[in-house]
């Protein structure tokens, strides 16, 4: 049982595979689909991806460590470009060789100090560690409303292209980043478009003074949140004005206290009357929807952009769950079972790719030191058991399940570096993966 099992070959799974390969840790990787890429592959059954989807973090600040996105890509690459980049990453580091495609994991169970993994074909394999990296957007959350609806009801995970809206009166329920994108598609293609929201949001444009917003924030001085927030709030007000005049409710939280809604098209469509804002749905009445303010609209299609229930079906019982989120040290290490990991089970206010690389670095060194420097691994075991860092960066996030595991990227990265220094592990440095490049 000297091998490690990696489940999933999306961005998180590829990140940890590269880290394991660099330290010569033997591993097997299982992917139920026919290729790498995870949710970014429109052909991957169950993916929530749609044709108009783009990165909400910019090209320069996204991408894997030491493998930047090509400068020929736009500021915000689309889903096909992200998929191509991700597959290029797998090829650059020769990661496909260890992946068994078309192979789903059915179950995992403890076996002494290790794990037994059962595949869909019934075969069983023993490993010393299991790394779950299958993502969080595979089980759509569908709300229910009283009444009867004569039209079509779907979750946004089934949506692919704006042609689905032609000639229809569309209601999008929910205004996260996907909901906003889809509402904009409906605004341009549907006979009528509405978006139902329960709360107000701070809408952040994708560019500020022509610079991608995350780059704009990174270029300036890194000031405390008590100074940054009022300055950025004032800037947004200057650029956009009062969004309540467009029908959006006043936010019930301060800027940065919820996942950023990054969208430059939504304000345009609201300003031009292409999409109308409605409050929460109260009930369904045949071909009409009644809202909590008593108003009604005739609707043909209700599309719920209401998020996903997190699940790890093949290992669900091994994790401790609270408010629908797994309890993990540094968002990755199980406190209950040694050598059970969850990679990618976090919400963060930045691009996740480099964050995956940073946490993968810890996972790989921890696994290596269990065999080569057991005292160092034991020191990290004590941290897993006793360390409970606050990773919110001084922010008070809104009280929703989504924000329970939310971390501030700047704080998170800094703490990961501190842990590495404390244990004696190296942090990510340019050139450290050159030895495992396929061309090397």
Describe each model-derived feature in a short phrase.
Residues 2-55, 68-178, 184-201, 206-207, ...:
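Flavin (primarily FAD) cofactor-binding/catalytic cores of flavoenzymes
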Residues 61-62:
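Active-site segment of extracytoplasmic enzymes that catalyze sulfate/phosphate-ester chemistry
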Residues 154-157, 386-391:
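Non-catalytic, mobile gating and regulatory segments of ester bond hydrolases
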Residues 210:
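Short, surface-exposed amphipathic charged segments that create phosphate/polyanion-binding patches used
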Residues 217-218:
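Conformationally flexible catalytic loops at phosphate/diphosphate-handling active centers
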Residues 372-386:
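Extended, charge-rich low-complexity interaction segments
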Residues 379-380, 388, 393-397:
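Short, structured protein-protein interaction patches enriched in aromatics and acidic/basic residues
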């Amino acid at each position: 049982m000297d091998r490690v099992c990696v489940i999933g070959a999306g961005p998180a799974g590829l990140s940890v595979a590269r880290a394991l390969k660099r330290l010569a840790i033997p591993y097997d990787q299982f992917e139920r689909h026919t290729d790498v890429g995870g949710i970014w592959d429109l052909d991957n059954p169950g993916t929530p991806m749609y044709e108009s989807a783009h990165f909400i973090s910019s090209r320069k600040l996204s991408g894997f460590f030491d493998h930047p996105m090509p400068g020929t890509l736009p500021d915000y690459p689309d889903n096909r470009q992200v998929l191509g980049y991700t597959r290029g990453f797998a090829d650059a580091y020769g990661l496909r060789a260890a992946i068994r495609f078309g192979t789903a994991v059915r179950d995992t169970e403890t076996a002494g100090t290790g794990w037994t993994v059962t595949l869909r074909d019934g075969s069983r394999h023993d490993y010393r560690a299991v790394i779950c990296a299958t993502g969080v957007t595979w089980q759509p959350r569908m709300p229910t409303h009283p009444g009867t609806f004569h039209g079509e009801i779907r979750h946004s995970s089934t949506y692919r292209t704006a042609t689905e809206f032609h000639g229809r009166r569309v209601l999008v329920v929910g205004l996260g980043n996907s909901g906003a994108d889809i509402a904009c598609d409906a605004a341009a293609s549907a006979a009528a478009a509405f978006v139902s929201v329960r709360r107000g949001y701070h809408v952040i444009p994708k560019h500020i003074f022509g610079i991608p917003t995350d780059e704009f924030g990174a270029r300036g001085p890194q000031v405390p949140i008590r100074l940054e927030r009022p300055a950025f709030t004032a800037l947004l007000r200057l650029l956009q004005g009062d969004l309540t005049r467009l029908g959006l409710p006043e936010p019930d939280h301060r800027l940065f206290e919820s996942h950023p809604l990054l969208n430059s098209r939504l304000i345009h469509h609201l300003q031009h009357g292409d999409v109308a804002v409605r409050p929460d749905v109260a009930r369904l009445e045949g071909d009409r929807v009644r809202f909590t303010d008593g108003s009604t609209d005739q609707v043909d299609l209700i599309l719920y952009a209401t998020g996903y229930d997190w699940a790890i079906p093949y290992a669900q019982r091994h994790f401790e769950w609270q408010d629908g989120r797994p309890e993990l040290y540094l968002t990755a290490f199980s406190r209950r079972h040694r050598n059970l990991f969850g990679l990618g089970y976090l919400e963060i206010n930045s691009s996740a790719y480099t964050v995956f690389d940073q946490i993968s670095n810890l996972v790989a060194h921890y696994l290596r030191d269990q065999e080569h420097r057991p005292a160092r691994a034991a020191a990290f075991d004590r941290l897993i058991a006793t360390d409970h860092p606050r990773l919110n960066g001084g922010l008070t996030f809104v009280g929703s399940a989504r924000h329970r595991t939310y971390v501030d990227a700047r704080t998170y990265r800094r703490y990961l570096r501190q842990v590495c220094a404390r244990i004696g592990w190296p942090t990510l440095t340019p050139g450290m993966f050159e030895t495992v490049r396929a061309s090397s």
